Each structure stands twice: as C-alpha cells, then as structure tokens.
C-alpha cells in the first residue's frame, strides 16, 4: 500500500505542476515585461526574456503531493505515525529545510525583479540567510535526537565526528545551495539532473529501510518531470534561484534527516561540478590574474566549446546519472 502512496504522490506532483505551469508561464511572462531593460541579466536576448520564478510551481505542487501521499501511507499503515524512528518528524524537518531554502531563493529572484540588484540578494545577506536555514534544520534534528554524528566512508566504515558534525553538515547545506544557484542558466539542466537525483534518492531510501520517506523524492520527481515540459530547451520557464535552492534543500536535507548526509555529495554531483568550477576559476584568477577555464560554470564552458542547449542538457544529465550510480554503489 505504501507503494501506492508513492505512485499517488508522483502522479499528483506531475499533475499539479503541469496545471500550475499552464497558469504561471504566461503570468510570469507578463511580469518579466515590466522589468526595466537595464536590469536584465547579461545573457542572450532569448534567455533574458525567460521568466525565472518557476520554482514556485515545484514548491507548491510538491508540498501538496507529499501531504496527500503521506496521508495515504499513514491510512494504509497507521504505525508510521508512532514509529520509533520518528518518520513523520524527519519528513517534516526535511520539508521545512527545503521550503526555507526555497524561500531564500524566492527573495533572491524578487530582488532581481523589484530593484536594480541585477544579481539578486547581496552575497553576505544571502549567505547569512542560508546559514540560518541550515542552523534551523540542524537544531530541529538535534532536539528530536535525529542528528547524525558521523558519516560512512568507503573502506573506513562509520567515522564519528563528534562536535564537528553539525559544523560540517551546515557547511555542506550552504555550499550545496550556492552551487545549485550557479547552475540556473542552461535550459533544463537543473530539473533534468535533479530528476535523476530524486529517482536515486527513492531507491536509496528503499534500500536503507526508509521506504515511507520516499514520498518526498517521489512527489518531487513527478513535479520535475512536468516542469521539464516548459524548461526543456528552448525553455519557456526557468526554476530561478527559488527552484535551484529548493532542490538543493531537498538534496541536502533528506539524506541528512535519514542519517546519511554523505549521500548529498554523489547525488548532487552536477551541482558540485558547476559550483566547484566557479570556485576554481575565482581562486586561480586571484592568484595568477588569468582565468583557468575558458568559461565557468560547467554549462557555460560547454557552450563556449560549441555545445548547443540540448547537448548541454544531455551532458549534465549524464553527469547526474553517474552521481546516481556512485550513490547506489556507495550503499551496497
């Protein structure tokens, strides 16, 4: 019966996102027309006219689909509500973390639309908000006795980190959010790679004994599949910082809530590659005064080498599948 709950969450996530996309795509197109020309991002003329608040579709539809899916699961198996592993508590904390990061992304997108802040929120306030969201998630996990104190390392087993664990988890959440933010630019890549990650997260939660909590990645996978109807190249709607940070919140908070925070590394491999390339570019330029790469992040580098939007999409999705394979191999 729990399998039915996962299917219901996935189908509902798809249907709600498709319906919201039909409503929001023309609405956001109209809002984008009121944005002054000098505030447009330095992209191609076609890209600059693509509205970037589509992440709201993902946030709203996933939240509703998870609610329906979890209710169906609890009706089929009432013991989930009083489980010793605190399944409902962990699910609510993961949802809270994802929504909190998504709200920060929404503020970032709103800053682009309402002011002359071409790049959105300033760096320090944005990092402070992300750190606050990460701290809130960690505090909630610690208060409920769900915060992992170590991590699994290949060949070394479980390694206790003690008091350093919360600091490391917080850094991972903030770094993942920043990396995901840099990935919004190429049509379809964020949603395509996140879809592969959600499929992997469902399989991993099933394998690790957290099958009921797979309702969240199931709902989001359905929502992402529907969102690709507008986000596949050429995109008519982009997730924006709202969608990117929301997806980063899910990829960071769900593994953390089930005690396997290290899974965020392989599952979010495309995001880490995008953000890591930007970091290397900045550091190398500051040290030598010359760029290390022809362009950064990764999708810009591929475009600079002549790859078209569809080719970039497939390359990034292939990298996401590689990360999925690494994560599955990691838990064997």
Model-derived segments and their meaning:
Residues 22-23, 29-36, 270-315:
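Membrane-proximal soluble regions of multi-pass membrane proteins
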Residues 309-330:
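Final/C-terminal transmembrane alpha-helix of multipass membrane proteins
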Residues 54, 137, 251, 277, ...:
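Alpha-helix boundary/capping detector
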């Amino acid at each position: 019966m729990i399998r039915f709950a996962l299917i219901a969450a996935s189908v509902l996530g798809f249907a709600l996102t498709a319906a919201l996309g039909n409503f929001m795509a023309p609405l956001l197109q109209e809002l984008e027309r009121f944005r002054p020309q000098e505030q447009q991002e330095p992209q191609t003329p076609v890209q600059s006219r693509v509205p970037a608040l589509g992440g709201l579709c993902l946030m709203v539809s996933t939240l509703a689909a998870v609610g329906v899916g979890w209710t169906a699961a609890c009706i089929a198996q009432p013991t989930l509500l009083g489980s010793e592993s605190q399944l409902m508590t962990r699910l609510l904390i993961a949802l809270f973390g994802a929504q909190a990061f998504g709200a920060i992304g929404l503020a970032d997108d709103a800053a682009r639309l309402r002011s002359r802040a071409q790049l959105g929120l300033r760096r320090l306030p944005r990092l402070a908000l992300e750190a606050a969201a990460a701290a809130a998630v960690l505090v909630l996990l610690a208060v409920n006795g769900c915060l992992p104190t170590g991590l699994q390392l290949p060949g070394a087993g479980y390694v206790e980190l003690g008091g350093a664990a919360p600091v490391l988890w917080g850094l991972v959440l903030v770094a993942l959010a920043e990396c995901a933010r840099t990935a919004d630019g190429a049509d379809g890549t964020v949603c395509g790679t996140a879809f592969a990650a959600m499929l992997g997260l469902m399989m991993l939660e099933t394998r690790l004994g957290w099958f009921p909590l797979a309702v969240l990645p199931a709902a989001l996978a359905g929502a992402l599949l529907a969102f690709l109807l507008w986000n596949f190249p050429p995109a008519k709607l982009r997730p924006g910082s709202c969608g990117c940070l929301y997806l980063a919140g899910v990829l960071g908070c769900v593994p953390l809530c089930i005690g396997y925070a290290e899974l965020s590394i392989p599952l979010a491999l495309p995001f880490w590659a995008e953000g890591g390339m930007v970091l290397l570019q900045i550091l190398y330029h500051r040290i030598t005064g010359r760029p290390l790469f022809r362009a950064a992040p990764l999708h810009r580098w591929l475009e600079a080498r002549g790859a078209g939007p569809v080719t970039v999409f497939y390359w990034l999705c292939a990298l996401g599948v590689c990360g999925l394979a690494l994560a599955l191999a990691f838990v064997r």
